[in-house]
Amino acid sequence: MSAQQQKDIKWAGSSKEDLLSFPREARHEAGFQLGQVQLGLEPDNWKPFNGIGAGTKEIRIRDKDGIYRVLYVAKFEEAIYVLHCFQKKTESTAQADKEIAKARYQAISKR
């Protein structure tokens, strides 16, 4: 994919502000990984994220300050949608974070 063919990133809800609140290292890593997705590549550390909507993926970031997640979907032709960005504080993803991402996915799907 050439630079002209990069997909735009669209931020759902407060996802951009949430990402900008990450510590510097985690924020830069998230930006780099989203750049990979824009180029049509896979992020370095990701997995499918079930229960939100078809095609939802999770970028996994770990730094000295904690564990961070960026939930996104790249299956739509027009853009990559960042659904939710958050710091993970427990072994499993909090239900509130899942509900935020699911509501944003549903809003995007209805467009």
Cite the ranges covered by each PLM segment.
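Basic, Lys/Arg-enriched alpha-helical interface segments
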Residues: M1-I67, F76-A79, Q87-R111
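Portal/gating segments that form or line small-molecule/metal binding sites
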Residues: V70
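Conserved catalytic cores of phosphodiester-cleaving nucleases, focusing on short active-site segments
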Residues: L83
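Short hydrophobic/aromatic beta-strand micro-patches
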Residues: V73
